[in-house]
């Protein structure tokens, strides 16, 4: 054992396995590190048999199982119907798929398991392999083994595919389907050459079979520091699962910067959110938008993991053995850039007396300032007036008929709701998309410039996707010929594809080095004097993996680290060269100094149910926290992903309550097929904008100072902003609550400033406050 000490912390390092026990002398809490290996025989996933969306069958379903009588067709478990790819998180090891059945002799099972990585691999795929499963009869039903030898070290998740059949008229009953951990032979890393030097512990850390780096552990006051070093050009093609996140061994909540923020119970291993939320890389939609993770142990304090080098890192989230207790455990993994080490890594564990997420946000705000991410709206406006255009604006992504666009603008002017970013180019002509020149030639854009200049027009810009054939959109041959030589090549010389449109047409991925050429091409084709789109949303810029920038074409080679720099450069280039106000889809803190808004992260993206179209909420409200807003509300705004813009969906009051609670902006999608002008939808939209403005106009430059849950179930929440505005919202659809002598009915909002009520919900759909 090696020991390190500071004025606050005692660290005992185990030189046999690389794990530490850290005692916080201020809180008297003992924090232990664990590798993400589940306990033997622990259930790491329990299939919800009452979830009809993952079964292709008409049999009766309930929490007690599946029951019925076979006809001619088999019934199937199809997890892809309601699980985000890459599926259920898993750490490589040996597992067993178990099926409990009351009639084990009656079933025939054909099955396989698909293994996925959350990081686009070097050949351009997420699917690693498909392995057939051999089910055998047991005393409780059936089982099949999953072997670690079949899992690559970069396996992050799995999807099960199963087909059950039997003779016609055979009665059957499936009580339970679950995945159980068997054994994992060894730790994910090995330690050697341990030594002490200048109040530090140094050692050689080896991941997998060959990947070795030098590690130094030191301690300063309330922080334990890990530094990992190797030659930048050293080959590095495996995962390095180190250093582990500390855990108390008891109940705690993980504070996760996934979209707006999540608070997940570590020990609630059956909670749907725990096994359906993919963490993944930093600064990509399935991953995390801040280089941070938190552990809230309530009165026992808290711990923050701060990743100072996040660009070649991901976080997994699996069931682990936390001192004998099955617990979900986030685990940090470093990997190479184009197969080399590329940069040295640094991780800090900062221990807090108060583990509450609000306190963590205040601490992280200081860290963000140190890193240069805490760039407020006011500071950006002083630097560049183009930042002023979009502060406090809502987004309208219009899919209306283009002839109705002046009427839409008239409605916005009449209602006094001109604080919007409006997209013209999703407009339709009898249902078909228009191209940019049609709007110009018809004179709509000229009319707009003369009559509606207070409304800022914006346009999508997609520097990544290239279609070489017609599909959902007509082929742009001039652009295709211009861009095709900049397609990303994999290490095997294959051109990589990304997005697939609704017609099944796959787009090629373009190299990040093409970004400036793309924008120059677009602005030459659509000059601002004729096409007054003064704001640009860079589509998918911060939703996609930095790995998609790994290009092996010798004419324009690119790496992950270069891709991150190019993302910043293209936003800066658009603003400085063309005086454009720029925004992105997806959220990443390192882009804050370059833009004002990020689309989507008010949703919990890449989670089943991100919109009403999937007939469910995206996440339990008691799991959601406004961590992004607590850190960055006065720096960068977020809003719902575009699916939430549908003006007809039934959960609009919930969406608007959450927007007001978080002090954010609205997202609206008026669509031609609903005839929004003649059905009252536009009038309702402008009424909603006026209501949202009650908060937004008051807090758009504010920091968020506090957030709290006012009821045990988390339904009623309150936020407080630096101007003194407080917002209380009931996010529950069917239940009223008594709060401070007031009855707050479902989906209601109360806004106060300096103790005076300035708004309360009083409408049939949104409930009331009495």
Enumerate the language-model features and the residues they cover.
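Active-site-proximal substrate-binding groove within the catalytic cores of carbohydrate-active enzymes
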Residues: 5-7, 11-43, 293-302, 309-360, ...
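Extra-cytoplasmic beta-strand recognition segments
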Residues: 47-49, 57-59, 81-109, 144-145, ...
């Amino acid at each position: 054992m090696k020991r390190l000490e500071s004025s606050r912390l005692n660290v005992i390092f185990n030189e046999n396995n690389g794990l530490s026990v850290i005692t916080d002398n201020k809180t008297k809490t003992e924090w232990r590190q664990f590798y993400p290996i589940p306990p033997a025989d622990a259930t790491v996933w329990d299939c919800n048999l009452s979830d009809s969306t993952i079964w292709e069958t008409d049999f009766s379903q309930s929490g007690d199982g599946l029951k019925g009588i076979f006809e001619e067709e088999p019934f199937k478990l199809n997890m892809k119907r309601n699980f985000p790819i890459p599926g259920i998180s898993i750490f490589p090891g040996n597992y067993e798929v178990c099926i409990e059945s009351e009639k084990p002799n009656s079933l025939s099972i054909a099955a396989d398991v698909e293994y996925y990585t959350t990081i686009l691999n070097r050949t351009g795929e997420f699917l690693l392999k498909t392995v057939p499963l051999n089910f055998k009869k047991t005393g409780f039903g059936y089982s099949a083994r999953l072997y670690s030898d079949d899992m690559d070290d970069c396996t992050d998740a799995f999807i099960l595919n199963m087909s059950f059949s039997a003779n016609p008229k055979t009665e059957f009953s499936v009580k339970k389907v679950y995945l159980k951990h068997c054994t994992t032979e060894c730790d994910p890393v090995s330690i050697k050459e341990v030594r002490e030097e200048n109040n530090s512990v140094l050692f050689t850390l080896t991941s997998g079979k060959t990947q070795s780096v030098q590690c130094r552990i030191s301690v300063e006051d309330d922080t334990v520091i890990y530094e990992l070093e190797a030659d930048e050009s050293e080959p590095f093609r495996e995962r390095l699962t180190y250093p582990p996140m500390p855990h108390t061994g008891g109940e705690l909540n993980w504070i996760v910067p996934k979209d707006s923020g999540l608070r997940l119970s570590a020990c609630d291993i059956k909670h749907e959110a725990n096994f359906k939320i993919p963490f993944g890389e930093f600064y990509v939609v399935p991953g995390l938008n801040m280089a941070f993770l938190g552990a809230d142990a309530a009165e026992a304090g808290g711990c923050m993991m701060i990743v100072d080098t996040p660009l070649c890192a991901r976080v997994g989230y699996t069931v682990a053995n936390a001192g004998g207790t099955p617990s979900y455990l986030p685990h940090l993994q470093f990997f190479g850039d184009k197969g080399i080490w590329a940069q040295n890594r640094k991780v800090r564990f900062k221990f807090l007396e108060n583990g509450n997420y609000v306190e963590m946000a205040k601490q992280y705000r200081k860290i963000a300032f140190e890193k240069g991410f805490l760039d407020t709206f006011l500071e950006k406006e002083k630097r560049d007036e183009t930042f002023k255009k979009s502060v406090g604006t809502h987004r309208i992504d219009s899919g209306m008929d283009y002839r109705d666009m002046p009427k839409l603008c008239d409605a916005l002017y009449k209602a006094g709701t001109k604080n919007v970013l409006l997209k013209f180019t999703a407009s339709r002509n009898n249902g078909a998309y228009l191209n940019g020149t049609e709007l110009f030639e018809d004179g709509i854009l000229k009319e707009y410039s003369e009559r509606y200049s207070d409304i800022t027009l914006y346009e999508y810009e997609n520097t990544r996707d290239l279609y070489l054939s017609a599909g959902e959109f007509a082929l742009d041959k001039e652009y295709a010929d211009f861009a095709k030589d900049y397609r990303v090549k994999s290490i095997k010389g294959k051109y990589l594809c990304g997005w697939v449109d609704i017609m099944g047409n796959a787009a090629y991925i373009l190299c990040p080095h093409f970004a400036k050429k793309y924008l120059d091409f677009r602005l030459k084709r659509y000059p601002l004097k004729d096409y007054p789109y003064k704001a640009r949303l860079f589509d998918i810029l911060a939703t996609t993996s930095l790995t998609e920038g790994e290009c092996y074409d010798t004419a324009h080679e690119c790496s992950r680290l270069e891709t991150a720099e190019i993302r910043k450069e293209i936003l800066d280039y658009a603003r400085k060269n063309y005086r454009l106000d720029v925004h992105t889809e997806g959220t990443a803190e390192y882009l804050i100094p370059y833009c004002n808004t990020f689309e989507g992260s008010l949703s919990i993206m890449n989670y089943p149910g991100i919109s009403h179209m999937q007939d469910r909420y995206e996440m339990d409200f008691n799991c959601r926290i406004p961590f992004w807003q607590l850190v960055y509300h006065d720096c960068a705004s977020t809003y719902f992903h575009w699916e939430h813009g549908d003006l007809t969906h039934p959960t609009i009051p919930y969406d608007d309550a959450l927007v007001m609670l978080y002090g954010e902006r609205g997202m609206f999608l008026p669509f031609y097929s609903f005839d929004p002008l003649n059905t009252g939808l536009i009038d309702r939209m402008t009424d909603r904008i006026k209501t949202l403005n009650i908060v937004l106009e008051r807090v758009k430059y504010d920091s968020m100072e506090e957030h709290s849950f006012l009821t045990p179930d988390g339904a009623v929440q309150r936020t407080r902003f630096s101007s003194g505005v407080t917002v209380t919202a009931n996010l529950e659809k069917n239940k009223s609550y008594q709060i401070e002598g007031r009855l707050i009915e479902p989906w209601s909002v109360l806004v106060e400033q300096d103790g005076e009520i300035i708004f309360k919900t009083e409408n049939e759909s949104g409930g009331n406050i009495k």
